[in-house]
Design a protein with these regions (language model features):
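AMP-forming adenylation/ATP pyrophosphatase catalytic core
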Residues: 4-33, 50-57, 89-91, 100, ...
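ATP-dependent adenylation/nucleotidyltransferase module used to activate substrates
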Residues: 2-155, 185, 275
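Catalytic subdomain that performs nucleotidyl-dependent activation
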Residues: 133, 138-142, 147-237, 241, ...
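Non-catalytic, surface-exposed connector residues within folded enzymatic/regulatory domains
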Residues: 67, 208, 228-231, 300-304
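Short hydrophobic alpha-helical segments of the AMP-binding
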Residues: 41, 191, 334
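A structural signal for well-ordered alpha-helical scaffolds and beta->alpha junctions
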Residues: 1, 5, 70, 180, ...
Length: 343
């Protein structure tokens, strides 16, 4: 499927996620998307002079299936002649090819978090540790156009702001997403044409899981009744939103200072209600999300309504003490001072 590889090259040319000679870690779960990603990177390596390495995480959440995934990815790396790093969360160990390193116990499960968010943090922390240790430039993950559409719908339904709607970019710091403009159907066709095997996670069919319900119920309904190209439409929209968000982001540090914010990760954040109210409403919301991100690991469960509740507290003319509490956060206003901290 030359068209898929050409599409990825064109996408990379537009958004510049990599440059010639880059050393790239490919995050491979063993599923169809990551197997496709690895094969494409291997085929592009001679042209771009890439040096590649595989990283895999065995969460141990699916018992023998998790171990079979790990075995499959190890064999895949061997066939491509690539080195591999494996994090086994169940055994609390990192495997660097033949070497084994005992890890300290994982940090305690933080308040206000859920399992999915915490595992995501462990995953990206591991990739970054390997990147720094092995002196690599980038980490390639296999998010595709379907993932982008599913994610934006999830976040719209949860009331996300610009940050939540624009977080999956072609490149976020050291994270690149070469497949972000490629649909799942194209990926499966590529795997079939190239006779590439992959692992299947049966939990992806469980519609009790929010993302799966959107994937198997909502998106097909929207495609049939409203827009047959809804996935591409949503994915393209996110790229536009990302540009708008980047503009706000460029000015957020200055805005936080103008709000008189004093950030202390342990004690939380204190800001001036009067100074905060002088900011443009769009900047206010962005400031609050940035401030909260300094004291809370993940903002996935922070909805637009939560942000608006804090804005209302800062704008209130009431003289009595005002309080709010949600998603592990506490907010308290006394006079001009508004304090935000982890419950």
């Amino acid at each position: 499927m030359k068209n898929l590889i050409k599409n990825i090259q064109n996408f990379a040319g537009r958004y510049g996620p990599w440059k010639k000679g880059d050393k790239i870690i490919a995050a491979v779960s063993g599923g169809p998307d990551s197997v496709c990603l690895l094969d494409v990177l291997v085929k592009l390596a001679p042209k771009y002079n890439f040096k590649l390495r595989v990283a895999h995480i065995n969460y141990g959440l699916r018992g023998k299936d998790s171990n079979r995934d790990e075995k499959f990815v190890r064999e895949l790396a061997r066939r491509y002649g690539l080195e591999i790093s494996v994090l086994s969360i169940a055994k609390n160990k990192i495997y660097e090819n033949a070497k084994v390193f005992q890890l300290p116990p994982n940090p305690p499960f933080p308040k206000g978090e859920n399992l999915e968010n915490w595992l995501r943090k462990i995953r990206y922390d591991f990739f970054e540790k390997i990147r720094k240790k092995e002196k690599y430039d980038l980490i390639a993950v296999a998010h595709n156009q379907d993932d982008q559409a599913e994610t934006v719908l999830m976040r719209i339904l949860r009331g996300a702001g610009l940050q939540g709607l624009s977080s999956m970019k072609p490149k976020n710091n050291k994270i690149i997403r070469p497949l972000l403009n490629t649909g799942r159907k194209e990926i499966l066709e590529y795997l079939k044409a190239n006779k590439l095997k992959y692992r299947t996670d049966i939990t992806n069919k469980d519609i009790k899981i929010f993302r799966n319900k959107i994937r198997h119920r909502l998106i097909p309904y929207l495609e049939k009744n409203y827009n047959p190209n809804i996935k591409k439409t949503l994915a393209d929209m996110v790229l536009v939103i990302a540009d708008d968000y980047d503009y706000l982001l460029a000015n957020e540090e200055r805005a936080i200072k103008r709000a008189g914010a004093d950030i202390n990760k342990k004690g939380g954040v204190i800001l001036s209600a009067k100074k905060f109210q002088k900011l443009h409403p769009a900047v206010q919301r962005q400031c609050l999300r940035k401030i909260i991100s300094q004291i809370k690991t993940d903002l996935t469960d922070i909805e637009a309504g939560h942000i608006e509740e804090i804005v209302k507290i800062t704008a209130s003319a009431k003289s009595k003490i005002q309080k709010a509490e949600f998603k592990g956060l506490k907010i308290k206003r006394k006079g001009d001072k508004v304090r935000i901290w982890i419950n």
